[in-house]
Amino acid sequence: MDLEAMLASYPDFPKKGVLFKDIGPILRDPAALAWAADELLRRYPPADFDVIAGIESRGFILATIMSARSGKGMVMIRKPGKLPGKTVKLAYKTEYGEDILEAQHGSVKSGERVIICDDLLATGGTAAAAASLVEQVGGKVAGLAFIVELAKLCGADKIAGYNRKSLVVY
């Protein structure tokens, strides 16, 4: 399936000089969305991981579908203050400043192999922080899965120590 042809582009969003790649058209097409999840599961067979983590917010969509299709649990990696109970936090730098990611304490068990999902890999800051957070709570990063990768932003460099799979690379 040609996901690249389905992506919408928005220049100067969210700030001047950025060409935003929107997965919205893929989300609106159930066949394309199912294909994307299935293709990533083909690249990361369920025997190779124990749980899937989705990064807020568009990573939740892909992770939920992959979780249901693989029969594996799904963990949310969220912005601060969005998860109940005890959480583990990790601060990291972004291209816009600094941010924090959280996961619920105990959501990833020690030694579990985790696939981390997000819609897009750009500078790699969020993906690297999510990987560090998974490791901080005792998990092992089995891989990172993206619908889109913006190669010119060199995000892959920040997660070079991990296996990554992207369906569309610009």
Swiss-Prot record:
Q: Name one GO biological process term.
A: purine ribonucleoside salvage
Asked if Cytoplasm is a keyword of the record, the answer is yes
Q: Does the keyword section mention Glycoprotein?
A: no
Gene3D superfamilies assigned to the protein according to its UniProt record, in alphabetical order: 3.40.50.2020
Q: Which reaction does it catalyse?
A: AMP + diphosphate = 5-phospho-alpha-D-ribose 1-diphosphate + adenine
Spell out the subcellular localization from the entry: Cytoplasm
Its subunit composition reads: Homodimer.
HAMAP family named in the record: Aden_phosphoribosyltr (MF_00004)
**Family designation:** Belongs to the purine/pyrimidine phosphoribosyltransferase family.
Q: What is this protein called?
A: Adenine phosphoribosyltransferase
Q: What species is this protein from?
A: Cenarchaeum symbiosum (strain A)
The organism that produces this protein has a lineage beginning with:
Archaea, Nitrososphaerota, Candidatus Cenarchaeales, Candidatus Cenarchaeaceae, Candidatus Cenarchaeum
